[in-house]
Amino acid sequence: MALYLSEKDVRKLLTVEMALEAVESAHRDLAEGLAVDVPRARSRLPQTVLHILQGALPAQGVIGYKAYTSNRSGNRFLVHVFDSATGVLRGVLEADFLGMMRTGAASAVASRYLAPKGSVVAGVFGAGWQAEGHIRTLCAALPMQSIKVCARDADKLTNFCARLETEMGVRVRPSNPEETVRESDIVGTVTTSATPLFQEGWLKPGVHLNGAGSNALIRQEISEAVIRRCAPIVVDSIPTALAEAGDLLPLLEKGRLHARQLVELGDIIIGRHPGRVDDQAMSLFESQGLAIQDLALAKRVLDAAELAGLGQNWPLQMES
């Protein structure tokens, strides 16, 4: 019998460490040819957009998809997980928190492999739901000592930083754009900005950048000048990046960047690509989000739910 897990169930079961391990395993499987990932498809109406990501991790025993709607009233996320050997439905998970944690985990895993040695200071643009996931996962992946956060809403930013500092025991403080970037070992962008968030001259040598908000051509968080200085330029999936990476698409269209220059995160994880080779060079990870990240994490949450006896039996029984 399949399980249905609510947001409340998922929050009880999902840990930061689980998210980091799941996302890294998904990228490893993809690099080793043990995964199938289909780029996001969208059906658009004036009021509502339906987004679907699908994929499979047969070595982990799962195949499935995430479907979510975006509307002025909010977003709604569901992940459907099937047994890859039998095709039987294993579970349906409400996936707002799950998606937040897997998105943050992708940038955190990339930082673990690409950030300069001894990284302890990070700057983050954004003080919303996804920014929180980035900060929590980054602090679990690396021994961060200080997080500087920049956002437009001053009151929201102050409350956001105070809450995370109290909950995490790491210094989290409000900052302006320049202070957020200067002297940061890692800089993350988690916004919907249509224009670059910081100037090239503010970045210190060797900084690692995580771009996670620019998943459409109309969005651009990181300037072309900054991107052209980065090596390597790492993506979660080249096909997905070529379709959605708003930071990269203008450079690709102008011929100032070529697809062959892009490196998939999984290739660095398995050692096929060396990753950072120059301590003074800037590195960049562009995160768009993959179905296999959701599936790997959902599988682990389902396993934990079965052990803990959480969740509801899915009410529909399919005829054989």
Where on the chain are the PLM-derived regions?
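Glycine-rich Rossmann-fold phosphate-binding loop(s) that bind the pyrophosphate
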Residues: A127-G128
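N-terminal ligand-binding/catalytic initiation module
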Residues: M1-M100, A108, A115-G118, I292-L295, ...
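Conserved beta-strand elements of the Class I
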Residues: A122-G123, S283
